[in-house]
């Protein structure tokens, strides 16, 4: 099972997105778990992640996450502002799964 880890400043805004993503994944029968963590906790939850998606408001932290994930073969990406703002769950899931491979 693949795990998508979303990260934002406090975990609040992404929690709504996670709910939409979970609903979309279930409707499509995808074997994926999706969870949100605030920035100050996310680094402690990388080991079982298949991909880390950062909210656009913390895109500045991408380099730090790439460094932390480098030896673990975990891709890191920033969710595009338009997709994040529109809560485009399916588009975000599809992008994440494409990067995971």
Residue ranges and their predicted role:
Residues 2-39:
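Conserved active-site segments centered on acidic
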Residues 3, 75-101:
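Ser/Thr/Gly-rich flexible loops in soluble cytosolic domains mediating phosphotransfer, phosphorylation
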Residues 10, 57-59:
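Short glycine-rich anion-binding loops that position phosphate/pyrophosphate groups of nucleotides
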Residues 61-83:
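A short, gly/pro- and small-residue-rich
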């Amino acid at each position: 099972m693949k795990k998508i880890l979303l990260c934002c400043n406090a975990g609040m805004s992404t929690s709504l997105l996670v709910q939409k993503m979970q609903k979309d994944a279930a409707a499509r029968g995808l074997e994926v778990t999706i969870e949100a963590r605030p920035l100050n906790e996310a680094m402690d939850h990388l080991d079982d992640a298949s991909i880390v998606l950062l909210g656009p408001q913390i895109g500045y932290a991408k380099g730090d996450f790439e460094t932390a994930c480098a030896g673990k073969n975990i891709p890191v990406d920033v969710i595009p502002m338009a997709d994040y703002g529109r809560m485009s769950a399916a588009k975000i899931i599809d992008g994440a799964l494409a990067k995971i491979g």
